[in-house]
């Protein structure tokens, strides 16, 4: 379990890989996933490395596969994903893959080009068909005398006087429907009203051959006189991207053309169907293998990218690599290298040699499907230094527990648990489906977090005795009313005249002792329920928050002990723990003391902790209305405040001064030159312990100059941040109380405003009404209390773990 509570022990290893076996060895190491390669060519340009051509070839294959995938998705063909993890192809197989992908890409491009040309011809013929159909209606209307009178205005008055025959030209075409109004105004203004426009809508939308979108269009015919107007009309049509088509003048010619167009449309439709069938077959065949192809190509690209990080021996027969790897996995890494050498057919084994280094290794925390989500929560705030305590195991308990304190409801916890259990039991099937829904994938990846949050919420709901805003009377209330009549001053007359009465726990028999588990259900109907729960939850939030913060500070002690840094213990951890304990730890003790020191008989004389805590910082003890909790309280509190104040310079000044003293001492004990001869003063045993180089530190101390100003600034920032953080974070933990109160109130409002209405119906149709009201209640419960309130509590729990 050591690797769970602290990051894995890492080592730097050097690999000697034979050129013919390097590809397979890196492939096996990649499948193992236990090593991190270092870049041994940092000064070499990316485009000048040895395997850059292979990387480019892989990128080109990846581009072709993305094109094929785009076409598959455009055709709405499901991509088959069996969850198979194919082996990486050998380098010699790259040519076959390239040829296969090139063939598929060229075939699809050719099909798309031909299909686009066919669709363009089909669109033109379809538009021509509608033009012939609509223009026939226009010409039939020309026989109307009213239309002739309207059209006669196109002639000059002088021509009408001479009795010249009416000779009008016309053009016909198709234009997008939304451009018709602007098109008509432009014609009227440019041609000064000397044209006659008729238009009719095409009922069915037409497919654009380029984009594949369906567009609504209209047929138009424009009558004019003279070549000048004809040229203007054609330029306007060209500007509005209208398609013009030849239209015969005689009905017989139009009829013959329409017949020919319909025949060509039928033939073209048949060719289009065959082309689409062929395209579907090609895409369906590609959809079966494209996921496997993607994995193969990307594995090859990753291998060649990794090989570019290696150095090449001068003999060009060996590749040298440096990797960080866990010490516990060295045997499996050796086995992977042997397996890669065997697959390549090489007779020379690969060599792994451990190296000594002062560089800080990377942090590696082993996870599984259960701990992965909690580790991600920790890493979202920051990844710890190498071999530091890993907070993730503790977060497995603290995170869902703090969430449950805010979300505590037995009923809602059961619902959340059932949802998480469903995802856990069906995780294999859900993983195999490879859902593209990002929101669902996010929720599913945190299924074990949700499971624990639901279980802890069920537990805290039982403590709060809250189930959908109602209490569970499992053991019977510990409060009794009868002693108030027999031993108290209650009577029937008092009940009739007094709307509100208060039970007196000081009377024997009224209060029978604490409830066996959780809060007594009698509080659910008490008028002072909110005041009681607020007091309880507020104090509980402060207690939990301070314990959580003290635990976080205590974890730093384990790091200081492990890294053998006594200076950080004496000048960091001890003043920090004293500062927090003397102020906020004392507050927790006061809370418990007040709970135990005052009972039902003396509770009326109990002083206010808030006033005492404020007066503690103000050194104000003249208020006689708020009496002391115990003897010697004033002296003890003054002592604690002074101790806390002394801890501030202890944290702020002591460490920089000690570090400066150690630096000057090392410098004095260092080497000196006398007449060109280097002479050194060897440190004593005590000094050697002080200046011992820590190989596990975050950086190498060799060659570093001590900067006193930087150290003082850093320590000042840390001290101010810690002191202010103790205050602000303690206040932040009050959100446990606030969100718990909000959740309980929302649950009560939802019950009162929704389900209570259905239960109050006493008519024959009450069951039917209750059915629909319960459906609304269930939907609102899931949407508001589970999703919205759950997400809010999750984010606040995350915030509290970041401040710990």
Residue spans for each PLM region:
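Conserved, carboxylate-rich catalytic/transport cores that coordinate ions
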Residues: 2-11, 18-34, 182, 292, ...
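Long, charged N-terminal accessory/stalk domains
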Residues: 1-394, 399, 410-412, 423, ...
């Amino acid at each position: 379990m050591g690797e769970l509570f602290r990051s894995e022990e890492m080592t730097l290893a050097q690999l000697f890989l034979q050129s013919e076996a390097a590809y397979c060895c890196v492939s096996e190491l990649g499948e193992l996933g236990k090593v991190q390669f270092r870049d041994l060519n940092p000064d070499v340009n990316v485009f000048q490395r040895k395997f850059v051509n292979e990387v480019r070839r892989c990128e080109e294959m990846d581009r072709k596969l993305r094109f094929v995938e785009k076409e598959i998705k455009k055709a709405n063909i499901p991509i088959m994903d069996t969850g198979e993890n194919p082996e990486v192809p050998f380098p010699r197989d790259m040519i076959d893959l390239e040829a296969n992908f090139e063939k598929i890409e060229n075939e699809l491009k050719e099909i798309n080009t031909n299909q686009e040309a066919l669709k363009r011809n089909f669109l033109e013929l379809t538009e021509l068909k509608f033009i012939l159909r609509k223009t026939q209606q226009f010409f039939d209307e020309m026989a109307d005398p009213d239309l002739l009178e309207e059209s006669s205005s196109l002639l000059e008055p002088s021509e009408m006087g001479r009795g010249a025959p009416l000779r009008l030209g016309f053009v016909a075409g198709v234009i997008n429907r939304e451009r018709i109004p602007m098109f008509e105004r432009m014609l009227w203004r440019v041609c000064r009203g000397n044209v006659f426009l008729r238009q009719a809508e095409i009922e069915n939308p037409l497919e654009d051959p380029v984009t594949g979108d369906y567009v609504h269009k209209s047929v138009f015919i424009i009558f004019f006189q003279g070549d000048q107007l004809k040229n203007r009309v054609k330029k306007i049509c060209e500007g509005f991207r209208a398609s013009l088509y030849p239209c015969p003048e005689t009905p017989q010619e139009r009829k013959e053309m329409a017949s020919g167009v319909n025949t060509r449309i039928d033939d073209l439709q048949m060719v289009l169907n065959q082309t689409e069938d062929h395209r579907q077959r090609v895409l369906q065949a590609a959809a079966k293998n494209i996921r496997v192809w993607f994995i193969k190509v990307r594995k090859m690209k990753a291998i060649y990218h990794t090989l570019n990080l290696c150095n090449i021996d001068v003999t060009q027969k060996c590749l040298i690599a440096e990797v960080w790897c866990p010490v516990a996995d060295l045997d499996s890494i050796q086995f992977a290298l042997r397996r890669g050498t065997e697959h390549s057919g090489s007779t020379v084994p690969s060599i792994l040699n451990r190296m000594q280094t002062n560089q800080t290794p990377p942090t590696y925390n082993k996870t599984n499907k259960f701990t992965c989500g909690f580790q991600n929560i920790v890493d979202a705030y920051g990844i710890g230094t190498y071999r530091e305590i890993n907070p993730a195991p503790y977060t497995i308990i603290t995170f869902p527990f703090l969430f449950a304190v805010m979300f505590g409801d037995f009923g809602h916890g059961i619902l959340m648990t059932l949802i998480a259990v469903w995802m856990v039991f069906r995780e294999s099937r859900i993983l195999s489906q490879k859902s593209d829904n990002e929101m669902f994938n996010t929720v599913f990846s945190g299924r074990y977090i949700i499971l624990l949050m639901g279980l802890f919420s069920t537990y805290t709901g039982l403590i709060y005795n809250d189930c959908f805003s109602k209490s569970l009377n499992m053991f019977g209330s510990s409060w009794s009313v009868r002693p108030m009549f027999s031993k108290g001053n209650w009577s029937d007359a008092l009940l009739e005249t007094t709307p509100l009465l208060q039970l007196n726990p000081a009377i024997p028999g009224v209060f029978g002792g604490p409830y066996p588990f959780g809060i007594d259900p009698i509080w659910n109907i008490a008028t002072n329920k909110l005041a009681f729960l607020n007091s309880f939850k507020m104090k509980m939030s402060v207690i939990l928050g301070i314990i959580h913060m003290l635990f976080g500070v205590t974890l730093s002690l384990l790091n200081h002990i492990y890294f053998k840094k006594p200076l950080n213990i004496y000048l960091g951890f001890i003043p920090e723990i004293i500062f927090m304990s003397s102020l906020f730890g004392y507050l927790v003790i006061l809370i418990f003391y007040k709970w135990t020191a005052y009972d039902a008989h003396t509770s009326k004389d109990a002083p206010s902790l808030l006033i005492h805590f404020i007066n503690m910082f103000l050194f104000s003890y003249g208020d006689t209305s708020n009496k002391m909790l115990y003897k010697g309280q004033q002296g003890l509190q003054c002592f604690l405040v002074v101790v806390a104040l002394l801890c501030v310079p202890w944290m702020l000044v002591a460490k920089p001064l000690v570090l400066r003293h150690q630096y000057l001492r090392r410098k004095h004990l260092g080497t000196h030159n006398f007449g060109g001869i280097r002479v050194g003063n060897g440190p004593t045993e005590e000094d050697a312990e002080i200046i011992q180089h820590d190989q596990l530190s975050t950086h190498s101390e060799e060659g570093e100059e001590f900067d006193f100003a930087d150290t003082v600034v850093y320590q000042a920032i840390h001290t101010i941040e810690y002191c202010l953080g103790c205050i602000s974070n303690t206040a932040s933990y009050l959100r446990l109380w606030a969100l718990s109160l909000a959740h309980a109130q929302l649950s009560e409002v939802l019950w009162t405003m929704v389900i209570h209405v259905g239960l109050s119906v006493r008519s024959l149709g009450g069951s039917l009404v209750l059915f629909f009201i319960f459906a609304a209640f269930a939907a609102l419960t899931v949407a508001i209390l589970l999703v919205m309130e759950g997400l809010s509590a999750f984010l606040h729990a995350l915030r509290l773990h970041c401040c710990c």
